[in-house]
Amino acid sequence: IIPVMLRPFQILSVKGTSRSTAKNLWRQKMYPYINLFGLSIPSYGLMMALAFIAAILIAYHRTNKAGLDTDALLTLAIITLTCGLAGSYLLYIFVTYSLSEIWGSIVDGSFSVFKSGGLVFYGGLIVGVLSGWIYLHAKKASFYEYAAVIVPAIPLAHAIGRIGCFLAGCCYGRIVDTPISVYYRNPIGGAPVGVPVFPIQLVESACNILVFVILLIYTRKRLKAGSVLFLYALLYGIERFCLEYFRADEIRGIFLGLSTSQWISIAMIIFGIVGFVLARRRENRINKTRNDEHSQTEPLSDNIHSENSPSDVG
């Protein structure tokens, strides 16, 4: 399965290759479906499943290492995944159709706008985080502690998911003739067929891997640092705002020259900066309190030890 899925990437580096040869090499089928054991499996759905499994494994390991309840993590994963998918789909509906079209389909009972398929990552991220906060608050568990162990897994899962987008031909880039441009032959994902398309999905996947590594390094000595949530919001907000300029799929929802995702990215950046500063202050106060308590107990233990030790004989 891995060689089949990676075949579209076989000439990511075309340095020293003629442009015509590069074009011919890149005219490969992008595998919107992968045949396994006689079954035709959508590559997008397969990569989404792999992304979820990878995120669960990383989060489970980190949760166990932090001494948190792993059973609560599994319940949390199911809740956030379900709510996240719903939020991702709803945001797709709102950026694809006007409010009048949505309301009209509800009034006439056809619900036609809800019969189309599509997902927008930001919708899933926002609703998923909110649903996780509600669950942990009801359970009287620390949202920040669980966020610290779970959040680094999000960009990893997102990176794998974007490979699924690349294989399926959705979330595609602008039509531009570059050495790494790809040529889609199957219109099922919505990408234009037979023209050079910038592989923005792979670029975003690489950026998400970088964010994943940064978050792992940041939490190496701060395993329960809730500020990692805001650091992720800041990093991904900047990443997504910039990469949106290279996107060409129609689900953009342009307003005042910026896409819906860019407006959300601006909010994410502000949220990340403010939240990170406040969270770091909170963590510093907690660490200071713990250090003060530790320093107060040390003299007490020394006094007890000296009282119990035999006196010097002169």
Feature annotation, model-predicted:
Residues 6-9, 308:
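Compositionally biased, low-complexity intrinsically disordered regions
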